[in-house]
């Protein structure tokens, strides 16, 4: 029991000594030396503090096209040397590193300059590591919402170049000098600058909509601003990302193309169905709905029209032309000889030339001299007979009926009339009413056949116009669809992040100092 108490006392004593050493060190640095966090860590006012910066990307959360905002989860790595925080480890029990609150130290106050929500600083102020050499290392996490101008030219087959621009709003280029982080290559033992955004494969979460193509980092010097200005220098991290278009291809592009090709089916639909205008108007309304959906996903900009917007406008113009064509076709189809007279050029072009060029079948023609057989109902014949009798005068009909009623026609004596007629004349007198009725019916049937034939010619003109527009609209739709979408499919990000710079800014190709 005594041995256990002795061991426990030794552990407590050793822990207390360690804590006391850190407390004594902190008291020595901040109280005895009189550390002032408001003063830059330089021996003289003309010296410049070198601040090194690096960015580790944990997650590309989203890119909101409407707000033009890039949301990222990052770690902002900052390091510098503060000569006032140096100590001899042998004097403080071998303590070589301190973990201090950021409020206790001088900070370069580096912020995200192109933020889009008014939050310039990091979200969480974690502890700062201070080493005995005066080296200060700070790695705070942050969720940044940065401004990213969207180029909608090739949406949804687009790529974007977004930036995270860091600078110090409190100190100018004469007070601090910003650099990219420097590391040492263990193989060559040479130093190099980290000229890219760091991505840890184990801690990085892939984005389902965007693919990172390039992620370079640069220090930018702006000679147009004086060194006394905070805008003279900055460290900018670039994210060149390409959209994964599968979602939009499945949900917008494919339905748009299928609905667009439904518009040409209107030329196959017979005019007598009465559904031609219904079909084409439905297609036009569907395209309008898709255009509204696309406009809600993109920023309200007048700089460019997105690729899918160009296609929808092209389809709407084409469908509008189809609506006009359908109106003309229906007008031709329901024309009659009583309202319109077909001109010779219309007859020659639409009944002779175009049907032959379009390989349209001609209606079967009756042989020369063959009677035209038409189906007529008995009611029609009765109506025509009644029309015949209505043509004759009432006096003639009354005389005939009265003669038949009183038998005068059979009791005519040769004494009161002229000599008896021949048998041919008597037969002619009996057959004349029947022949007149037959001639009237034949005349009417000829007029009806001529009327129907002319109406059929107008129907053939409408069908020819339908077939002609089918052969014209279909290639236009196919070529327009391929041309517009091939522009987007072959829209790739540049092979190098910066035009004119042969360096690719990747870990595999380090530039040694």
From Swiss-Prot:
It catalyses: K(+)(in) = K(+)(out); Na(+)(in) = Na(+)(out). GO terms for biological process: acetylcholine receptor signaling pathway; chemical synaptic transmission; membrane depolarization; monoatomic ion transmembrane transport. One of its GO terms (cellular component) is synapse. Residues 333-467 are cytoplasmic. GO terms for molecular function: acetylcholine receptor activity; acetylcholine-gated monoatomic cation-selective channel activity. Glycans are attached at residues 88, 161. The keyword Heme does not apply. Residues 1-18 form the signal peptide. The chain crosses the membrane at residues 245-269, 277-295, 311-332, 468-490. It is a multi-pass membrane protein. It is found in: Postsynaptic cell membrane; Cell membrane. The modification Phosphotyrosine is found at residue 388. Disulfide bonds join 148-162. Residues 19-244 are extracellular. InterPro entries: Neur_chan_lig-bd, Neur_chan_lig-bd_sf, Neur_channel, Neuro-gated_channel_TM_sf, Neuro_actylchol_rec, Neurotrans-gated_channel_TM, Neurotransmitter_ion_chnl_CS, Nicotinic_acetylcholine_rcpt. Keywords: Cell membrane, Disulfide bond, Glycoprotein, Ion channel, Ion transport, Ligand-gated ion channel, Membrane, Phosphoprotein, Postsynaptic cell membrane, Receptor, Signal, Synapse, Transmembrane, Transmembrane helix, Transport. Belongs to the ligand-gated ion channel (TC 1.A.9) family. Acetylcholine receptor (TC 1.A.9.1) subfamily. After binding acetylcholine, the AChR responds by an extensive change in conformation that affects all subunits and leads to opening of an ion-conducting channel across the plasma membrane. Pentamer of two alpha chains, and one each of the beta, delta, and gamma chains. This is Acetylcholine receptor subunit delta. It comes from Gallus gallus (Chicken).
